Amino acid sequence: MTIFILLAVIGAIVQFWVPVNYSMVDYLPENAPSTTAMDVMEEEFDSAVANTRVMVQDVSVQEALAFKEDIAAIDGVNDVSWLDDAIDIRTPLEVADQETVETYYKNDKALFTLEIEEGKEVPATEAIYDVIGKDNAMAGDALNTAISQQKTGQETFNAAAILIPVVILILLLSTRSWFEPVLFLTAIGISVLINLGTNIFIGEISFISQSVAPILQLAVSLDYAIFLLHSFDDYRKTDSPEKAMKRAMKRSFPAVTASASTTFFGFLALTFMDFEIGADLGLNLVKGILLSFLSVMVFLPALTLISYKWIDKTHHKQWLPNRYPIGKFVTKLRIPALLLVALIIVPAFLAQNETNFIYGMGDNPDNTRAGQDENAIKDAFGKYTPIVLLVDKGDLARQEQFVDELSELKYVKSTVDYTGAVGTGIPPEYLEESAREQFFSEHYSRIILNTTTDTEGDAAFALVEDVKEVAANYYGDDYYATGESFTLYDMKQVVQEDNKLVNVLTVVAIAAVLLITFKSLSMPLVLILTIQTAVWMNLAVPYFTNEPLVYIGYLIISIVQLAATVDYAILFTEDYMNNRQEMPKFEAIKKTINEKIFSIGVSASILSSVGFIMWLTSTDPIISSIGILLGRGTLLAFTMVVIFLPALLVVFDKPIEKTTWRPNFYKRK
């Protein structure tokens, strides 16, 4: 017990030294084309792809140049580009190419593009706000990263501040002692703190793991502690505290092990993702489940035996009944339930794959400055997503033809390269070195496409494929392309492949645990069908409501919901199988529903509360989407377990008996 407390204290302290990574791009595989291109560009050129746009209103050209100089002087800001980098502003703007002019300067509004160094997003964006004031605007990927850094920790704290009282209330309503919730939360809280501390050995964690893993660990593993203490309470009626705890541990160990195993192996599947945010979250959750299991089976018994007198002194009447006589009613619904699910399951499966997915961070809410600024810049200058290409610098004639063809592509507004800005008639050696370095490195020539698509979506990804096709025609595989749309295109390819892999791994792993637990060939099919249908229904909702869904949230929840809520089906089915040995199937299912709906309801209410609180407290689109999917998915899983699963167990009673080793089902004499 002392060791657990000591480790928890150490974990609580060292967690603040664990770096948090807020960049989704860093979690792409190293061999992703856009990642390789970014690495090459950083080696060859001093500046990277522009990741921020700043708009200043009501300024002259000279005033805009002054703003440009002030912004460029900020630490962490590189390569500020404006109109003077595209044309000679000493000549009247009226005689210049108006499309080029209006890309940077329009209706007395100046639009700058710049790159903010990774790791300096927060101080740099704050300094830019100081320079431009509250009436001007800033948007871009670097700003989104800065917002995540500033808000994630505070929003996680806010979620915990709401969640813990809610969980305590649920536990108080479902137990008979004021002190028992303290034991539950202490045992799991200790394991959460240890888990946070062990991240120091990983090196860094993603902001998603920081936000989601501790809360999810708490919600999923509270069941283990509840089951142990409820067993302890039962044995206390006849045995001494020490003997009661031994019997409770013996009784609880198989059930808690089975429950933890399904969750453990489900979360373990996430670690096989190539998109390493999933692997990062999976590792954190796997560690969390293992530590929670150890805490419940080692730390909680010792803590309970020390403090059981406080349980006795703080007894109160049970405010909610633990039996609900609804089994007879639910049993009558078995055929309608089966028919309804049969009608829903195929459309739900198809719809959940056809949702409008977002692969990046999504848009900032309109009620935030970032969201309003983004809209203001789009309204004034339109959409802007730069694409950067690196090609062999030895053949300017070929490059000129290449750029001309790129310029003809839909959504390409303008291009910036040597052949367009200077011309093939002037040798690069005639330019000053500082000017030449804007276009050439030692090995490559740089071409920038200013496009008018969003960073992702059908139009953006179609343009990516068109650019790839044109580049391949001119340079084969000897080119590099990057930019946010290219990065998100790669992310889409990676996570879609991950989705196929981890879903198969999750189902196979959980099916194996269920096969061992129930010694039955049919039970894994019955239980996984029940929960997987709830998963498909949950993920189909955004399609029918026409709401975009962040794909990483979709992918994580498709695994987490199955792994976390299959425990409800296990608990229900174990009790049913025991009852079925003593009575006919209808009596067994009614008794199981009456007795288990309360305990399953407590678990589901805690997990769904976690989801809805994450949804309500987070402004991050990824965290928020995980929250709403978890909350809604848990309620759907609960509904399926108490209505659809009983129907399956009753209707397929004979096949279950024949495919189960020694079921010992009750036979009428």
Protein language model features and the residues they cover:
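Structured non-transmembrane domains adjacent to transmembrane bundles in polytopic membrane proteins
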Residues: 30-52, 56-142, 356, 362-523, ...
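Membrane-interface helix-loop junction between the first two transmembrane segments
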Residues: 19-27
